Amino acid sequence: MSRLPQRRALVLLSGGQDSATCLAWALARYGHVETLGFDYGQRHRVELDCRQRLIDGVRALPWPGQLGPDHMLTVDVLAQLGGSAMTDDVAIAMQADGLPNTFVPGRNLLFFTLAAALAYRRGLDVLVGGMSETDYSGYPDCRDSTLKALQVALSLGVDRPLTLETPLMWRSKADTWALAQRLGGDALVELIRCESHTCYLGQRGDLHAWGHGCGGCPACELRAQGWEQWTAQRSLNGA
């Protein structure tokens, strides 16, 4: 990975595995990195608690880049719009349009727009998000084409060149675990395994091999499968 120490990044940090890995990726690449979280009225607040533990844990590890301030914005308009299993107390199900009801329409578009506004104020020129087309549920605001178009729109909107980086766009969950290992070794993998939150049902409970969660929701299943694939590959490689 080539380093760009002169650039300053803002990482969208939710408290999950993907965004935590992206934070490590940014610290390995850029000279100065800040973090941004959103309280959007999500049903399960546990991911917001996990954010701070992840930040503290990442700060304790050695990185080429400097980890700067954390920022939190309240965006309760998404909960007001409702209709998603992420904001409303409803069972996870498929919608008539073929998308799961865990999709929060416009969420990533809004998050990146607010991130661009904050980056403008903070003198940051790179926005980093954990979106992926490889292991995802078809969310249209996670697509590479969507985010490339958004980069153009945001740069025009603030009259300043912004780069939207999505280092996991073409990586599977197994690849994401492998990337964390390359970036921060066993210490980072263990931090993400124990402190990040993925479960759609908000469960922490028992610590599984792959981390906390119910083990049955789509997010837990994807994370567990990725862990199993990655650890199996490591065993084959003698790691």
Swiss-Prot record:
- InterPro entries noted in UniProt: QueC, Rossmann-like_a/b/a_fold
Q: What class of enzyme is it?
A: ligase
Q: Which residues bind Zn(2+)?
A: 199, 214, 217, 220
Q: Which SUPFAM superfamilies match?
A: Adenine nucleotide alpha hydrolases-like
Q: Where is the signal peptide?
A: none
In the record, what terms sit under GO molecular function? ATP binding; ligase activity, forming carbon-nitrogen bonds; zinc ion binding
Q: Which UniProt keywords apply?
A: ATP-binding, Ligase, Metal-binding, Nucleotide-binding, Queuosine biosynthesis, Zinc
Its annotated pathway? Purine metabolism; 7-cyano-7-deazaguanine biosynthesis
Residues bound to ATP: 13-23
Q: Does the keyword Metal-binding apply?
A: yes
Instruction: Cite a single GO BP annotation.
Output: queuosine biosynthetic process
> Per the annotation, how and in what number is the cofactor bound?
Binds 1 zinc ion per subunit.
Pfam families noted in UniProt: QueC
Q: Supply the EC number(s).
A: 6.3.4.20
Q: Which cofactor does it need?
A: Zn(2+)
| Catalyzed reactions | 7-carboxy-7-deazaguanine + NH4(+) + ATP = 7-cyano-7-deazaguanine + ADP + phosphate + H2O + H(+)
| Family, as annotated | Belongs to the QueC family.
Biological role: Catalyzes the ATP-dependent conversion of 7-carboxy-7-deazaguanine (CDG) to 7-cyano-7-deazaguanine (preQ(0)).
Kindly provide the name given to this protein in its UniProt entry. 7-cyano-7-deazaguanine synthase
What species was this sequence derived from?
A: Acidovorax ebreus (strain TPSY)
Q: Quick one: which gene encodes this?
A: queC
